[in-house]
């Protein structure tokens, strides 16, 4: 099954997440099908906190991809900011 979820990158105590489309059987930070955005929880000042390609999200959800809980909240936030 294909899922849209977060893959952790960054350094120790400084998380940075890629929002990826991946097979649910693959490891969290393992192989992915497509990178569709990023999330920086520690963004300060003018740094971008969230970037997400909503067209690609809709494409993958239309094909039957499931969305993780945290990613669903981020998609909702990105859609609100885009409107």
From Swiss-Prot:
Database matches in HAMAP family: Ribosomal_bS16 (MF_00385)
Gene that produces this protein: rpsP
Record GO terms (molecular function): structural constituent of ribosome
Family: Belongs to the bacterial ribosomal protein bS16 family.
Protein's name in the database: Small ribosomal subunit protein bS16
One Gene Ontology biological process: translation
Domain of life per record: Bacteria
InterPro entries for this protein: Ribosomal_bS16, Ribosomal_bS16_CS, Ribosomal_bS16_dom_sf
Gene Ontology terms: cellular component: cytoplasm; small ribosomal subunit
Organism (species): Photobacterium profundum (strain SS9)
PANTHER family referenced in this protein's UniProt entry, alphabetically: 30S RIBOSOMAL PROTEIN S16, SMALL RIBOSOMAL SUBUNIT PROTEIN BS16M
Record keywords: Ribonucleoprotein, Ribosomal protein
